[in-house]
């Protein structure tokens, strides 16, 4: 199959998750992959960037080949996102006409998703919407109501809606207001990466981040979004850090909250124990997770977090690391009942649990629920769904 993926983020800069893993694994199975990105954060000092088309090596699997398309951008991040809704369809239409795919898979909604859906109807190309979050809740904007309309349009008119967890399926069905089935396809987890670190590897991780051998590490991995809950948790965890000098809070990633979190750590007097590691390579996250005593997912409970399935939690659990998380519907629908996942919405109580678990000495264990994300099986499920969609004579 020729599969045309699109998303409203940068393929080359975004931390790795299923938008990289599915296309690259499908390419390794023999499918031709085109990916339309939006290079968020691109800045140009002198001139706009014309549409580009290039073949790149995979970010997860270097032997995979992805044909990457980048539309016009003017180098003004605050303006480019809005302009992209207008200019991207022209690039997309040209590509669809000149190199017609068998099926389109969209992670995108407002930037390029609804426009590509309209084009797919005109050209009679099957359109799959991969719903992994609630689009109109991701960013705070005066235009959220427009994003909500676009999301409803995409959900109600896509030929197939594929979700990554049962809670997201319930949300999609409610918005679709139809009995049309929703496909559940688990995101792929390549367990070949999830190797327990040796003592030597653990020592290297500790040395890299200035940790002492006797330190206990609480890990947060991912983006620092406004709904991450990191600030609220840190305020409650600071007294624990002050009481326990051997406790360290390691934050791997970055985002819009980073400066605010650094300032908060300084104000609370714990900046020496809160370590900002920045983004790391995909291959390097696994020994970090394995070296941590406890991992954290303090996302503020809301629509955007309830219906998502945080990739970091899957990675934490795959390494046998105990996870403390707010109680989120998506997580509970998949991992509910797992002893390795502790759910708590009160941040003060969460800080107490973190202290208890960081001092615990029980061996690490991997929950059985992780098996449903096994990469080969999940990719095969996704491939089967796409093959079925591509063979429809009348995608309407």
Predicted regions and their residues:
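N-terminal subdomain of nucleotide-sugar transferases
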Residues: 1-55, 240, 328, 393-396
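Conserved donor-binding/catalytic core segment of Leloir-type glycosyltransferases
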Residues: 4, 212-237, 378
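Nucleotide-sugar-dependent
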Residues: 13, 228, 283-287, 293-315, ...
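An aromatic- and histidine-rich active-site surface loop
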Residues: 16, 20, 81-91, 101-123, ...
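Membrane-proximal helix-turn-helix segments that form the acceptor-binding/catalytic region
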Residues: 21-24, 90-97, 114, 118-122, ...
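Donor nucleotide-sugar binding/catalytic pocket of nucleotide-sugar-dependent glycosyltransferases
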Residues: 37, 148-202, 274-276
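Nucleotide-activated donor-binding/catalytic signature segment of Leloir-type glycosyltransferases, i.e.
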Residues: 259-284
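Conserved acidic donor-binding segment of nucleotide-sugar-dependent glycosyltransferases
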Residues: 337-348, 355-360
